[in-house]
Amino acid sequence: MHEGNRSPRPMRMEAKTVKPRHPLVSRLAELLVSTWGEYLQLEPYHLPADLGFVEGQLEGDRLTIVNRCYQSRVFRKLHLELATIGPNLDILHCVMYPRPQFDLPIYGTDIVASTQMVSAAIVDLSPVRGELPPAYLAGLEPSFARCTDFGQLRNLPPWGTIFSPRCVFARVVTPTEADLFMEISRAYLRFHCEQAARAEAVDTATEAQILAGQRHYCEQQQQNDKTRRILAQAFDEAWAERYIRTVLFDLPQ
């Protein structure tokens, strides 16, 4: 099942891009792009012109950031960020923000990878109105149960109360673990897109609750001081704050 009645359109690649060194980052980016193109009717989402492709310096290393943003009937913003720092570090960040008219959780995934290993790989569907819906708890359970196969599961940060009981957060050391993270990510993403295709608009009172929940999600994510510190070092504090509030975790209106 796909969103709307028209045939899905492929995503148009941005003119400027980065080439991740770690294969898991490339594989996950390709999965996100292809799945969005398969399930969703995509329209452009316009970022400020100076924030789509960004270059800076971080402790002598070149920092390059490329953002791709789209929207659809159900999602107000589909954001994929790819970044490289120097010759050895890759970062992937993705959030799928539903429109507040639809009672859906927020899909998010991040990878931080060096050439040797993935120090952090996370995927989740974060609830915005109470608990994660029963359909999601049940639908994600078979894939979530496999997270015990990771050798090193990680603890969530103190501000991570926004994440769900189905959150997978691990270090990825071996090719087998990389395949496992891809399989879990694919299952989560496809399940979410299938649920989105069936989503119907909610009443005004429920929409207000969803809007408040999405704002809380963004406010909690904005507390990630590590992201702010890296961006401030590469650019400056004012730029970092604008980028976080405009590109990464903008509050829905």
From Swiss-Prot:
Task: Spell out the disulfide connections.
Answer: none
Q: What is its EC number?
A: 1.3.7.5
Record flagged with keyword Oxidoreductase: yes
The UniProt entry, under Gene3D superfamilies, shows: 3.40.1500.20
What GO terms are given for molecular function?
A: cobalt ion binding; phycocyanobilin:ferredoxin oxidoreductase activity
Q: Which domain of life is it from?
A: Bacteria
Q: Which GO terms describe its biological process?
A: phytochromobilin biosynthetic process
Catalytic EC class: oxidoreductase
Instruction: Please explain the role this protein plays, according to its UniProt record.
Output: Catalyzes the four-electron reduction of biliverdin IX-alpha (2-electron reduction at both the A and D rings); the reaction proceeds via an isolatable 2-electron intermediate, 181,182-dihydrobiliverdin.
> So what family is this one in?
Belongs to the HY2 family.
The identity of this protein, by name, is: Phycocyanobilin:ferredoxin oxidoreductase
